[in-house]
Design a protein with these regions (language model features):
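Active-site-proximal loop/helix segment associated with metal-binding centers of metalloenzymes
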Residues: 1-73
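Catalytic metal-binding/acid-base residues of hydrolase active sites
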Residues: 41-43, 92-98
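Binuclear metal-dependent phosphoesterase catalytic core
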Residues: 76-84, 96-126
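A structural motif corresponding to the C-terminal end of an alpha-helix
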Residues: 28-32, 76-91
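Intrinsically disordered, low-complexity regions enriched in small/polar residues
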Residues: 5, 12-13, 19-20, 80, ...
């Protein structure tokens, strides 16, 4: 966290959080959520390890815990959407600077490597 603040890699209010009361305010008949675009994804999505993050982990003693917490937030959001009848079909994320597509429980999870110059409409949305 300190390293990210010094290097201005994060804004103070950037960390995701789970707010079930706000989620309850979403009327799925008016705003049917079927696609999620986020910085990272639930913990059950690729990658499930921190392999390749050694450099960053040595410069930020809180990074490992921060990553775990972020992914737990998205675990909770995913569970809420599924349990409350939202017809989730796609989830796009890019945090890990790699490319991967997988289907989990009927949802297409797309890890987008923006360095490849991907386009959301061709890589994930379609």
């Amino acid at each position: 966290e300190a390293y990210r603040k010094i290097k201005r890699l994060y804004w103070d209010d950037e960390a995701p959080y789970y707010d079930e009361e706000r989620l309850k305010m979403i009327d799925k008949t008016v705003c049917p959520i079927d696609i999620v675009c986020s910085h990272t994804a639930p913990s059950f999505c690729y990658p499930q390890t921190k392999e390749g993050l050694d450099y960053w982990l040595t410069h930020d003693k809180n990074l490992s815990e921060d990553l775990d917490n972020e992914r737990k937030v998205f675990d909770n959001i995913y569970s809420y959407l599924k349990e409350n009848g939202f017809e989730l079909s796609k989830w796009c994320y890019g945090h890990f600077h790699k490319h991967n597509t997988e289907y989990i429980d009927g949802v297409k999870f797309c890890l987008l490597d923006m360095d490849r110059g991907v386009k959301l409409d061709t890589e994930c949305i379609n």
